[in-house]
């Protein structure tokens, strides 16, 4: 092997913030459905501990063997709304606490899948599960939630959009941090290893290993070597860098699966930033040529970055999946925070950026007095982008009681610090209150 390639890999880890962001075990809980919530909860806890008992130990051993940091060890499970048909509200709470306790018992960082898929309609159990979010997200430590309210095939469930906006307001009144643990999706994927939106799809194996890589700092350092070169050279440099990053993810994921006796699922190529300087997607975009992220040209630069990441990744692995692109969470990215404080980056610009990247309006703090209908309308706008363009979009928005524009909130750790961003004050209430269903686009009709 070329010694320069070895040195490059060492430098990626030691100087450029490269890491495996997550090794996530997906576990099907469909065989855990019991006669009531209590029995389902007991079966859920037993299966998770049985399947994932050695996940953390195995990942830590691979960290030592290869010197590659694995930041998070996580679990995703079957959407809980599919398990809880026989449960009442108290039964749902018992299942939630069993999931949280199982995650703690096996030592993982997070467990995702307290979720509902309601893009076309909602069952009584699904409505009850959403109603439980304020209590569940404020009383559990490791549990993550998601809702899928739209898809290209189904259109947008505006009733669910309205209910979700009201639920987000209720969560914020109990604990604003609870909304950092809830993602609202259009076109959610079944094999996403990243939180808070991970769940284990019904078409997946009984248990599987998925990996999420991360390397904004590696991409930024690579682009520093091609300053003043044409944009074609920039795209090629990102592509070759993504190839190297993905190969490491493929290696770690495959070995983890082999050691645990499970099938290997996918590598998610997403560039996931952290609040640390030098580990920022915004800084990558600025290295492409923007004075500050959010200025004119940002959407074009992000499209280039996202596309080149995908092209490099699919050359490195046959098993690419999840969201696979660039994440733009405001509170988790030092460059995004700077641009927000400077007034360069707005919610409207972030919405435009989501049309060409992996996710959506992510980790955005807004004034505590924002109406629920405005939050619902933000979700509807993001869903429209995803539905029309046949891609995943999402919203993770955090109303902060008592805070207004100019203030900020510090979530700590990887969640970072969020400046309070302004929202448009004109009302969307009449639109959201119409309810019903926004039809699927004509191009979704393919049969």
From Swiss-Prot:
Organism domain of life: Bacteria
InterPro entries found in the cross-reference section: UPF0210
Pfam families recorded: DUF711
Family recorded in the similarity comment: Belongs to the UPF0210 family.
Record note on quaternary structure: Homodimer.
Full protein name: UPF0210 protein OEOE_0945
